[in-house]
């Protein structure tokens, strides 16, 4: 029988707790209870809640990077890659309650750690998009533009369509979101042939 990885057990329990209760309301006691370990076990791996939260963010960010890199095919056009990455990230977001909870906590309480966590996630996405936009610009697939500005705008559009819209309307399907990305981006930055 394989040994139990207590550290991973703690991380999974903390992820679950942060996703259910948010950063502010999560306690080490809750994490210990969910992980079915003593509170002291948590402190053998993490000195405090902030360090545990940071590790979870590192894992989430790495998972998102892996998704993006897996879905980018060098032989494919920029927009084909964009839509593949978008599909996968939409599925990831749907299945990852932590990011949704952090956004809600930031909105409701303005928790600094929630803001910093979401900012880290956004920076990784922005850096990735900026690099891909630069490549697309160099290959002539998109018009001359500032990749950082376009990356920022793409992230805001993504958040608007996947989250902000849902506050007052029925959520958009993946196909609708892709359709709006096509409408707003391809007609705006795609090279006209």
PLM feature segments, named:
Residues 90-130, 138, 167:
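Short secondary-structure transition hinges
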């Amino acid at each position: 029988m394989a040994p139990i990885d207590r550290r991973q057990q703690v991380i999974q329990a903390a992820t679950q707790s942060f996703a259910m209760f948010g950063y502010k309301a999560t306690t080490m006691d809750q994490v210990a209870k969910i992980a079915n370990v003593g509170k002291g076990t948590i402190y053998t791996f993490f000195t405090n809640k902030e360090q545990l939260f940071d590790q979870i963010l590192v894992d989430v960010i790495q998972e998102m990077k892996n998704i993006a890199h897996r879905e980018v095919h060098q032989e494919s056009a920029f927009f084909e890659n964009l839509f593949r990455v978008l599909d996968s990230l939409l599925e990831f977001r749907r299945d990852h309650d932590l990011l949704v909870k952090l956004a809600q906590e930031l909105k409701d309480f303005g928790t600094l750690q929630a803001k910093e966590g979401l900012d880290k996630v956004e920076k990784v996405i922005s850096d990735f998009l900026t690099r891909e936009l630069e490549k697309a610009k160099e290959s002539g697939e998109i018009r001359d533009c500032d990749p950082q500005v376009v990356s920022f705008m793409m992230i805001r559009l993504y958040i608007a369509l996947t989250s902000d819209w849902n506050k007052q309307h029925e959520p958009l399907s993946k196909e609708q979101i892709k359709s709006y990305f096509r409408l707003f981006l391809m007609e705006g930055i795609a090279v006209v042939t």
